[in-house]
Amino acid sequence: MKYELTATEARVIGCLLEKQVTTPEQYPLSVNGVVTACNQKTNREPVMNLTEQEVQEQLDNLVKRHFLRTVSGFGNRVTKYEQRFCNSEFGDLKLSAAEVALVTTLLLRGAQTPGELRSRASRMHEFSDMAEVESTLERLASREDGPYVVRLAREPGKRESRYMHLFCGDVDELSLQTSAPESASGDIQSRVEALESEVAELKQRLDSLLAHLGE
């Protein structure tokens, strides 16, 4: 597989994939939009505090690598960015809506169980049941042009195995286990986080609308 992203590059791409689906009226994103998305406190793990300069450097690098492209003109006063990471006209990586939702959530939050993924990815794709989540993960793990995700060894005392994306290279399972946050009620926490993300998205839309009306 030809993808070797840094953690920050994965965050930038994940944000663009997310916003393309959840807030299409604000997509493509400006540099400021990408900064805000990267530093969101909801649906992000770990929470980052990237500067505009740091994000601009990542954007420039990803454009050179053909994972993003710039969009300007047609009345746009600022340069905006859209992803070419997957499902682009000339790109090789083609993903279904379900696969995009899972890959995006893994890029933004790291290793997660199928249950966590189903809840957290629900704003991008409504999975009918857990079987659909698991079959989509297995498809991503066994693709001939992949694999793009890997199933991690089940941790002691946990009911579900976690999955991790492979777009940043091979996974250090020991490191993931030692850094994994403890969660006594993962399903409830995931639902709360999903609701918090929806509120954040709605606030962002309202701010954008008010700014537009004030112009």
UniProtKB/Swiss-Prot annotation:
What name has this protein been given in UniProt? UPF0502 protein YceH
Q: Where is the signal peptide?
A: none
Name the protein family.
Answer: Belongs to the UPF0502 family.
This protein's superkingdom?
Bacteria
InterPro entries on file: DUF480, WH-like_DNA-bd_sf, WH_DNA-bd_sf
